[in-house]
Amino acid sequence: ENCVNGAKYEVAELLITPLTLGDSILSASEKRSGCALVDMGADTTTISIYSNNILRKLVVVPIGSHNATMDIAYCLKIDVEEAESLKVKYGRAWLEDYEGAQSKILKLSHGRETNEGRLCEIIEARYEEILHNVWAQIEEDSDKLTSGIIFTGGGAQIAALNEAFKQVNKRDKQIRIVKGMPADICMTSTTYIPDNGRTSNILSLLLHGDQNCVIYQTEAEKEANV
């Protein structure tokens, strides 16, 4: 707001990202019957609980998927970019077959190696912490969440997130992971936007920018409108 005002423009409206995200991702039925929307970002995880079409609870937990990346970098003694690449390509939030994963060798920089089991062990520990924090915010209202829990954001794209969350809450709650884009987004053939949930926030904000705030009027038009 300060930046916009400093540029001598007026703020038309301030949008709250969790609200715009809920409007673009959740169906009317989900909001009405009760659900939890969990936006797993890089540095924060936002939990929004809806019931009877009203946002009942909004909590931001200061931990996200980047923490798992930093754990990988620290434990395997590699660069953060390499750690992120390994997490995206091979990472799992829950590794059931640990013995089998141990035999899958992953190449690291400077001629070093690790195995998929070790990588996922690091990721699983951090995701367990994140999901425990999520469940701590949801548990009290869990019986009211008829439409279950909806995950979105870049951190929610990791494999086996469903299984990891079930290990945390020990309940048979309906879980949906948003991977596509909002239905109202239209693109040209030359425009590429990753269809993986990582852009959900910015796209939801764009969908709410439905007013032309840069219409130029001549002095004559301004006088005619008075």
Language model segments and positions:
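Phosphate-binding glycine-rich/basic clefts of nucleotide- and phosphate-handling proteins
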Residues: E1-N2, Y9, L19, S51-Y127, ...
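Nucleotide/phosphate-binding catalytic cleft detector across ATP-hydrolyzing
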Residues: E1-C35, A93-S109, E113-L119, D141, ...
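Gly/Thr-rich phosphate-binding beta-strand-loop-beta motif of the actin/hexokinase/Hsp70
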Residues: A28-K57, I72
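Glycine-rich phosphate-binding/hydrolytic loop that grips phosphoryl groups
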Residues: V178-N225
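Short, ordered loop/turn segments at secondary-structure junctions
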Residues: I16-T20, V61, V88, V178-I185
